[in-house]
C-alpha cells in the first residue's frame, strides 16, 4: 500500500513539475531539484500510512506547483502504443485534466525509459463541445531527441511540436503519438497544451417556392356554346409562395360575361404542396383556332404559363333551290335543290323537306317520299365539304305566284342545324278569246228588223285585255241601235264598240246590234274581234236572207 501511495504522489508531483517546466516557469536545474525533493517527500509521507494526510499533502503540493482551477485525475496504468519493449521503457501512465472547457486533453508517458532508446508520448484530445481551430502544442523534453510523430509534424526552433485540427466535434477524439529518444539520465519533462475556439451553430431553414401551372380545356368546341377551361396552380417548392396572381387574357374570338379582356385572379400566399383550381368560361364568337393562355406570377419568382388550344367548330348546312321565275300553267317546271355541308362537323340524320304551294302538283321527285304537296329526302350522314343535289318536277293548274319552300334539318356534335330556302314562280295562264255571231230573225221582209247578237268568251286560263269589237254590214241592212258592255258608235253600215279593258278567264260578254232590212237580197254582217292576246284579229260572218 505504501508503495502505491508513493507512486501516486510521485507521478502527481512529476506531472505538476512538467507542466511548470513546459510553461517556462521553471528552469531545467530547478525542475530536477524539485523532482528529487518531491520523491523524497513522497517516501516520508508513505510511511505515515494516513490517507487524510496524503490528500492534504496532495492539495498543498498542487498549490506549490501553481496548478490553478484544475483537478488532476488519479493516475492509472496503460499499455504502451507500438511494439512491446519492456526492456527499453516502463508501463505507460496517463495524466488527465478535467475541466468544463472546450477540449479535454490527456497525456500518457512511460514510467521510465532507457537512454538511447525511443519511448512514446501519447496525447489524446477529446471534444467536450464542438470546436474549431484546435491547436495542440507538445513541449519536447530538454534532454531528448525527436524521432517521429503520428500525425507527422516538425519541431519548431524552440523545441515544440504543433498540430492543428480544423474541427473537433463534441465527443470526438484525436490521438497523437510522439516518439522521443532520451540522450542522458535524468527526468524527461514533457507537457502538452491545447487551444480551441468553441463553435456555435445555428440553423435557418431555407426553401424555394416553385409555382407550377397547368391548364385543361377541350380540343374542340362549338360556336356560340360555352367553353370551360380549368387552370390548376400548385406550389411544388419547399417554401411559401407569396402574392400568387393568375392572369388570363380573353383569347381573340372569345367573349367573357364580365366584358373584360383580361381576367385577374389573386390567390395570395400558397403553402408548399398547396393546390388551387380556377375555372373560366368563355363564349366563342367565330370559327377557327383559339388559344387560352394563363400566366401565374409570385413574389420573387419567375412567371409560368400554360396554354390550351381549342378548335371552334360551327355545324353548318346550306340549302338552295333554283327554278323558273315564271311559266305557263299546266307546263312542267323543274326545281333543283342543292344541299351542302360547309361546316366543320359531320351532319347526321339529314332531312330535306320540300313543301309546294296548293295548286301545284308534283310530277316527279327521284328518291323522295311524296305526300300530297310535300316531298322528303333523308340522308344518314353529310360530311364536311360534301354536297347533294335533288330535282323535283311540278306543274301548276291555275295561274298565280307560288312559292316552293325547302327546309333542311340535321344533327351534329354541337346540336341541331337547320337551313331553309325558297323559290317563287309566277304561273301564267293563256287567254283564249272566242266570238259567236247569230241573227235572231232570218229570213226578214224588207222593212222589218233583225238583231245580231255577238257573244265574246274567254275560254282560257288568263284574262284578256283591250278586247275590241267592230261590226260591218252589207247595204241590205241598216244599223238602227246597239247595246253591250261598252259604248259604241254607228257610222253608216259600221258599228264600233269601245275596247273592253279586261275579259277574265271563263268570262263572257254579249254585244247586240238592231238592224233594219232596207232591200231584198242575201245580206251579210261581219264581226271583227281584237285583243292584246290576239295577235291577228278574229272575224266571223253571219248572213241574213231579206225578201
UniProtKB/Swiss-Prot annotation:
GO process annotations (BP): regulation of cell shape
UniProt key word Zinc: no
Effect caused by changing residue 132 to A: In strain: DK20
Bias kind Basic residues: ranges: 52-61
Cross-referenced InterPro entries: Chlam_OMP6 (IPR003506), Chlamydia_OmcB (IPR051172), DUF11_rpt (IPR047589), Ig-like_fold (IPR013783), OmcB-like_DUF11 (IPR001434)
Disordered: annotated segments: 46-83
UniProt main location, coarse: periplasm
Biased composition (Basic and acidic residues): 62-79
One Gene Ontology cellular component annotation held by this UniProt entry: periplasmic space
Signal peptide: 1-22
Domain of life: Bacteria
Propeptide: 23-40
Localization of this protein: Periplasm
Keyword line: Cell shape, Disulfide bond, Periplasm, Signal
Cross-referenced Gene3D superfamilies: Immunoglobulins
A matching Pfam family: DUF11
Keyword NAD: no
Effect of residue 458 to S: In strain: DK20
One GO MF term attached to the UniProt entry: extracellular matrix structural constituent
Cross-referenced PANTHER family: LARGE CYSTEINE-RICH PERIPLASMIC PROTEIN OMCB (PTHR34819:SF4)
Record's function text: In elementary bodies (EBs, the infectious stage, which is able to survive outside the host cell) provides the structural integrity of the outer envelope through disulfide cross-links with the small cysteine-rich protein and the major outer membrane protein. It has been described in publications as the Sarkosyl-insoluble COMC (Chlamydia outer membrane complex), and serves as the functional equivalent of peptidoglycan.
Subunit structure: Part of a disulfide cross-linked outer membrane complex (COMC) composed of the major outer membrane porin (MOMP), the small cysteine-rich protein (OmcA) and the large cysteine-rich periplasmic protein (OmcB).
Note: The sequence shown is that of strain DK 20.
Protein name per Swiss-Prot or TrEMBL: Large cysteine-rich periplasmic protein OmcB, serovar E
Organism of provenance: Chlamydia trachomatis
Lineage: Bacteria, Pseudomonadati, Chlamydiota, Chlamydiia, Chlamydiales
Amino acid at each position: 500500500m505504501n508503495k502505491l501511495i508513493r507512486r501516486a504522489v510521485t507521478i502527481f508531483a512529476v506531472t505538476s513539475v512538467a507542466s511548470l517546466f513546459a510553461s517556462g516557469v521553471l528552469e531545467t536545474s530547478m525542475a530536477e531539484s524539485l523532482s528529487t525533493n518531491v520523491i523524497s517527500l513522497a517516501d516520508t509521507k508513505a510511511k505515515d500510512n494516513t490517507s487524510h494526510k496524503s490528500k492534504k499533502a496532495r492539495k498543498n503540493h498542487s498549490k506549490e506547483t501553481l496548478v490553478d482551477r484544475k483537478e488532476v485525475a488519479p493516475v492509472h496504468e496503460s499499455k504502451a502504443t507500438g511494439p512491446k519493449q519492456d526492456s527499453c521503457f516502463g508501463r505507460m501512465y496517463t495524466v488527465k485534466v478535467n475541466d468544463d472547457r472546450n477540449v479535454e486533453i490527456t497525456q500518457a508517458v512511460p514510467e521510465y525509459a532507457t537512454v538511447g532508446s525511443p519511448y512514446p508520448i501519447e496525447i489524446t484530445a477529446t471534444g467536450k463541445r464542438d470546436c474549431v481551430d484546435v491547436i495542440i502544442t507538445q513541449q519536447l523534453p530538454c534532454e531528448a531527441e525527436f524521432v517521429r510523430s503520428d500525425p507527422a509534424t516538425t519541431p519548431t526552433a524552440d523545441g515544440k511540436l504543433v498540430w492543428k485540427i480544423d474541427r473537433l466535434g463534441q465527443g470526438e477524439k484525436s490521438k497523437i503519438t510522439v516518439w522521443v529518444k532520451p540522450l542522458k539520465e535524468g527526468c524527461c519533462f514533457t507537457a502538452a497544451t491545447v487551444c480551441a475556439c468553441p463553435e456555435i451553430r445555428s440553423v435557418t431553414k431555407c426553401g424555394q417556392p416553385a409555382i407550377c401551372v397547368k391548364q385543361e380545356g377541350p380540343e374542340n368546341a362549338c360556336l356560340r356554346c360555352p367553353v370551360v377551361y380549368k387552370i390548376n396552380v400548385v406550389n411544388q417548392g419547399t417554401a411559401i409562395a407569396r402574392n400568387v396572381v393568375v392572369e388570363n387574357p380573353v383569347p381573340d374570338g372569345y367573349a367573357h360575361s364580365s366584358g373584360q379582356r383580361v381576367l385577374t385572379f389573386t390567390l395570395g400566399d400558397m403553402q408548399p404542396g398547396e393546390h388551387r383550381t380556377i375555372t373560366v368560361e368563355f363564349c366563342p364568337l367565330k370559327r377557327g383556332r383559339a388559344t387560352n393562355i394563363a400566366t401565374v406570377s409570385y413574389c420573387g419568382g419567375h412567371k409560368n404559363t400554360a396554354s390550351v388550344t381549342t378548335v371552334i367548330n360551327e355545324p353548318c348546312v346550306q340549302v338552295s333551290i333554283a327554278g323558273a321565275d315564271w311559266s305557263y300553267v299546266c307546263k312542267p317546271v323543274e326545281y333543283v335543290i342543292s344541299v351542302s355541308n360547309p361546316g366543320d362537323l359531320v351532319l347526321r340524320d339529314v332531312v330535306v323537306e320540300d313543301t309546294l304551294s296548293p295548286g301545284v302538283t308534283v310530277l316527279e321527285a327521284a328518291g323522295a317520299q311524296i305526300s300530297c304537296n310535300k316531298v322528303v329526302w333523308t340522308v344518314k350522314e353529310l360530311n364536311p365539304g360534301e354536297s347533294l343535289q335533288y330535282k323535283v318536277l311540278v306543274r301548276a293548274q291555275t295561274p298565280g305566284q307560288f312559292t316552293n319552300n325547302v327546309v333542311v334539318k340535321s344533327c351534329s356534335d354541337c346540336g341541331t342545324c337547320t337551313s331553309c330556302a325558297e323559290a317563287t314562280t309566277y304561273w301564267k295562264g293563256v287567254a283564249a278569246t272566242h266570238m259567236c255571231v247569230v241573227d235572231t230573225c232570218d229570213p226578214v221582209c224588207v222593212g222589218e228588223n233583225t238583231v245580231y247578237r255577238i257573244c265574246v268568251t274567254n275560254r282560257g286560263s288568263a284574262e284578256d285585255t283591250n278586247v275590241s269589237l267592230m261590226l260591218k254590214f252589207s247595204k241590205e241592212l241598216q244599223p238602227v241601235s246597239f247595246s253591250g258592255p261598252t259604248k259604241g258608235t254607228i257610222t253608216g253600215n259600221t258599228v264600233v264598240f269601245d275596247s273592253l279593258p279586261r275579259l277574265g278567264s271563263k268570262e263572257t260578254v254579249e254585244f247586240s246590234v238592231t238592224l233594219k232590212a232596207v232591200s231584198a237580197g242575201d245580206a251579210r254582217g261581219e264581226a271583227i274581234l281584237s285583243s292584246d292576246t290576239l295577235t291577228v284579229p278574229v272575224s266571223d260572218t253571219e248572213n241574213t236572207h231579206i225578201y
